């Protein structure tokens, strides 16, 4: 499906590719947004409106260019993201409503559209001039976590009994402050941030300064370099933090996925309804791993493609749930494939803020000495993973699911010749409903892992109360029951081996 495996590129999942795109000077096909036209032609204003989750096409003669005259809606009109044009029409989507000029305007001088002062998931505009733009955003949340009703210990697949630390505490869990924008040309974009996980204080990579740089050619292709999330599963495609829960994945998603790493990537669309990402990277997770610990083969790859057949979108930033209140059924099908040769030395710490250690389905880290028997130590393993996701949204309701497959093979190390290939698979499913539009959202999730070293599962239910009737501030409560979690670290609601109920309350700020 993807013909780009040999091109050293990758997907930009954390950086909003349409940020201040109306200043980019490029239309959907790469033409100037305010192209010079013949002074003899008369203005041809076109009004075009859309609602959240809807795409509207307005017939127009666009052969001589299109100019955004004025925005009339509440949602920002961002060129290439929420408005654009093709050979036969001007289109708007996701609440963008505006008036456009097509054809020539006598003696008109190209004007620079005013950048929006605020863009969701990009933040507030600090600087806007001919040299560049700077947006600032803040994401943070406070969490009360109660694990006191979990079992005190568990027995792994090899008969070892391990004690579980059961927490009850309050944390300002995470602090995330990115700066983003462009410099000298809107094609040259940056996304740089400081990230702190306070529950992991004292651990490696508890505070991270990172980011990426991107050159955007047009809506079909952007090339980036730096740190971003591998597009191994849907939740690492770039819609964070717009999940149903606050910064917590279900156990199957957490178990199978990759994490944040350094590399190069390619991102864009084959068609308005088909998006793609691809990345070549150092390893599955770079947080807390120095360059001296990484091998020199540059052999981690991850690819994804998403098809949105009905509406060409799946909500703002491709979010989970239908806060956007689609009036037409929105659908999505996504496919991901990843491969990496992982070394023992290049693994993040077990309490890393975005830990994605390779574990067996009982929670054991595969590189643990003597795990498979006395004198046996795995130093390297071949990791392959694939996932298929699908979902539908309509009038505040959503149903979304994903199935995962993982293959571990080619074990190398001390006395590893007798270790057979390991295959695991699993799924997650999530359903949600806006009980009170724009205010109260209810959701349910279930997840299961089928592994050679144990089958684990969880169920959870929760609510989101949007205090100001819009995204940005929400109070979240979530009750979960897990059976032998194979994943866990201080920034995650579960410890490894957890069995029993867990409850947490979160107050989230995101602008």
Go through each PLM region and give its residues.
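Extracellular, modular beta-sheet/disulfide-rich ectodomains of secreted and cell-surface proteins
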Residues: 39-105
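Short Gly/aromatic-enriched secondary-structure transition segments
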Residues: 151-158, 265
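N-terminal secretory signal peptides that target proteins for export/translocation
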Residues: 1-2
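N-terminal periplasmic/intermembrane-space "pro-region" immediately following the signal or transit peptide
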Residues: 21-43, 103-141, 148-153, 273, ...
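Outer membrane beta-barrel
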Residues: 123-149, 164-286, 293-313, 319-323, ...
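Outer-membrane beta-barrel pore domains
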Residues: 112-115, 149, 164, 327-511
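Bacterial N-terminal signal peptides
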Residues: 5-18
């Amino acid at each position: 499906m993807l013909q780009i495996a040999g091109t050293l590129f990758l997907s930009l999942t954390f950086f909003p590719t349409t940020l201040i795109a109306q200043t980019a000077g490029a239309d959907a096909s790469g033409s100037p947004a305010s192209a010079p036209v013949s002074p003899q032609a008369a203005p041809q204003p076109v009004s075009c409106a859309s609602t959240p989750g809807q795409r509207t096409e307005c017939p127009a003669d666009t052969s001589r260019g299109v100019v955004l005259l004025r925005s009339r809606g509440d949602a920002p009109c961002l060129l290439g993201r929420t408005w654009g044009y093709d050979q036969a029409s001007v289109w708007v989507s996701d609440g963008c409503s505006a008036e456009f000029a097509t054809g020539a305007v006598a003696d008109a001088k190209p004007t620079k559209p005013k950048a929006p002062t605020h863009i969701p998931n990009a933040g507030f505009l600090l600087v806007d001039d001919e040299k560049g733009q700077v947006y600032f955003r803040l994401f943070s949340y406070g969490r009360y976590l109660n694990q006191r009703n979990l079992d005190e210990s568990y027995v792994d697949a090899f008969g070892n009994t391990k004690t579980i630390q059961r927490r009850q505490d309050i944390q300002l869990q995470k602090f995330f402050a990115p700066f983003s924008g462009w410099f000298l040309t809107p094609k040259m974009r940056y996304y740089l941030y400081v990230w702190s996980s306070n529950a992991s204080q004292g651990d490696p990579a508890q505070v991270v300064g990172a980011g990426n740089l991107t050159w955007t050619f047009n809506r079909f292709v952007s090339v980036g370099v730096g740190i971003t999330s591998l597009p191994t599963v849907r939740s690492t495609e770039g819609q964070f933090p717009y999940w149903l829960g606050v910064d917590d994945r279900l156990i199957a998603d957490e178990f199978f996925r990759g994490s944040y790493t350094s590399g190069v990537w390619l991102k864009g669309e084959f068609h308005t309804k088909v998006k793609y990402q691809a990345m070549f990277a150092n390893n599955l997770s770079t947080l807390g791993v120095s360059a001296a610990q990484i091998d020199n083969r540059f052999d981690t790859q991850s690819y994804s493609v998403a098809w949105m057949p009905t509406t060409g979108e799946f909500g703002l930033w491709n979010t989970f749930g239908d806060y956007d209140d689609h009036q037409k059924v929105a659908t999505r099908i996504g496919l991901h494939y990843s491969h990496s040769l992982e070394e023992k030395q290049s693994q993040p710490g077990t309490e890393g803020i975005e830990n994605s250690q390779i574990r067996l389905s009982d929670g054991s880290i595969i590189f643990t000495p003597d795990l498979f028997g006395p004198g046996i130590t795995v130093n390297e393993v071949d990791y392959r993973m694939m996932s298929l996701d699908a979902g539908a949204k309509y009038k505040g309701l959503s149903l979304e699911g994903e199935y995962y497959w993982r293959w571990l093979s080619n074990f190398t190390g001390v006395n590893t010749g007798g270790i057979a290939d390991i295959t695991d698979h699993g799924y997650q499913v999530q359903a949600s409903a806006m009980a009170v539009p724009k205010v109260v959202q209810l959701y349910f999730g279930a997840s299961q892992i089928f592994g050679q070293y144990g089958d684990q599962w969880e169920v959870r239910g929760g609510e989101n109360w949007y205090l100001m009737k819009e995204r940005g501030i929400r109070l979240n409560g979530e009750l979960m029951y897990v059976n032998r979690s194979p994943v866990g670290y201080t920034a995650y609601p579960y410890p490894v081996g957890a069995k029993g109920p867990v409850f947490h309350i979160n107050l989230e700020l995101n602008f």
